[in-house]
Structures are given as structure tokens and as C-alpha cells.
Amino acid sequence: MQPAVDNQQLGSQLLKLGIHRNKRRIWLDSPAHLRAAGFLPGLRYRAEYLPGIGLIALHIDPVHGTNKVSKKSKGWESLPVIDINNKRIASVFSDDVSQIDVTYYLNSIVIKGV
């Protein structure tokens, strides 16, 4: 099952899959990519964990979203940040996965293990 995303790719990044408090951590803090995809501070989104295909998809969902885009301040500007730190990441990516390929689409972000 492939998550539904708009076909137009807005950008991509190769990032390190981190660890925080003994759990896998995904930290997305590229303002240009997040804003282009529509992920703004305070906006709600839902995460779709797909262990069978090694993929996590994030979808903007103002009504049913269970997660919120965080922010960090730089001067007077609020920059979007997505911080995912939970056990479900380990169910999607095996222990030998140390990097992730993050692809940005309008209203969606797809994260794959590398």
C-alpha cells in the first residue's frame, strides 16, 4: 500500500535517523522544505506508519491530525519543526537503518529508510 500523495515532488533530503532517550528520532527542521509542503507551525498532521514497506507518511489534517508542527524561534521568526520520537519508528525501520530519505510533496511528507 502506497500512501496517497500529490505527484509533484517539492524537494528531498537525506538525513540521519537520530536517537533520543533510547528511541529512534526523526527531526525535520528545513523551513524551506516544510513551508513549501504546507507544514507551518501550529498546523495539525497525522502520521501513517507502514512497516510492511518501510515508510512513514505525514499528511496535513487540520481536523483529525493527532500531531502538531512545532516551532523554533530565530529572531522574530517562527520556523517549523517536526520532531517524531516514539517506538513506532522502530517498527518501520530496522536497526541497521541509520539514514532516511525525506521527500516533500504538497500537504505530505514521505520518509523512507536508506
Region spans (language model):
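N-terminal intrinsically disordered, low-complexity, charge/repeat-rich segments that act as generic
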Residues: 1-11, 24
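Beta-strand-rich non-transmembrane domains
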Residues: 18-22, 52
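Short beta-strand-centered segments at strand-helix junctions
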Residues: 22-42, 66-96
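A short beta-strand-loop micro-motif that forms or neighbors metal/cofactor-
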Residues: 39-56, 93-111
